[in-house]
Amino acid sequence: FGGAFDLLEVSEGCSIAEIDVPDSCADKTLAQADLRKKTGVTVLCIRRLDENPKRPRAVLIPGPNDQIHADDKLIVFGTRKQIDALSGEG
């Protein structure tokens, strides 16, 4: 998985993985990043890594207006090829 950390293989060829935010997605909303259209992955969670108490530690099932920050981690679902394409971007 290149830059991705494989968390769980759901079925043959499909996994849930944690990846760093690609540079092209930092400081964009999920709608602006358009990851599903560009790579086919589904973002299940945005995990916040900073200690800022004003930001939640995790955004479960994020919506199109949820912001992606450079220091976040994305928990995504997709095929190995889709996840590799996304994690190779960053």
Tell me the role of every PLM-derived stretch.
Residues 1-27:
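Flexible, Lys/Arg-rich cytosolic regulatory linkers and terminal tails that connect or flank
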Residues 27-90:
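Cytosolic Rossmann-like ligand/nucleotide-binding regulatory domains
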